[in-house]
Amino acid sequence: MYYGNMKYNDIANGIGVRTSLFVSGCRHHCKGCFQPQTWDFDYGKPFTKEEEEKIAASLREDYVAGLTVLGGEPMEAENQEALYPFLKRIRQEFPDKSIWIYTGYLWEELTAEGSESVEAQPAEGSESVEAQPEEGSESVKAQPEEGSVQTEAQPAEGNSQRIFLEHRRYCRCRWTLPLLRLIDILVDGEFHEAEKDLSIRFRGSRNQRLIDVKESLARGEVVLSEFMYKEGE
């Protein structure tokens, strides 16, 4: 995996002072994207153990609230494979720090039992990451368990997220659920230039959602984070 930038003392991409990692590689190509150079999977520098250590060192500061991963697209299958062992380490070493991920994919795409699965492929010329999902965690498969009923995930009525049902995309892989279990907040949805709103917190456009990952996984439905709304809204 490559990354385009690391920001320390970032206050724009999540609650509190944060360290932010901008990974490379994105297939969304949103109109109005603020950093289209990160669409290229080979943009920037390789994300190595040295970069991991720099981020870990920054999180040891008491005033740093947590880590945010954005891009680019962290939830491209190639990036999920590289991020899983890193975020597992961060969660183990810093259990009191929050982890946020920004993705153009939808929660429904990442979690629906009936969604297609794609195998992560390393970028050409890069080494494959041999990390394994957490012991005891479920492997994410495209097919439901034998005897279970396959259901179609439905977006909220009237929600612009219905693009999920019309143009299903390939983002779910063996790393997806193990990775989601490590994070606190998922900001989902592509940037929509027509819905751009500079007044909202931690989002570029109104279609995007701040999802409480732990509550959503526990309930089996999207639970919006309290951070979704600005004060007084």
Predicted regions mapped to residue ranges:
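Short, cysteine/histidine-rich loop/knuckle motifs that typically chelate Zn2+
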Residues: 32
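P-loop/Walker A phosphate-binding loop and immediately adjacent motor/lid segment at beta-alpha junctions
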Residues: 195-233
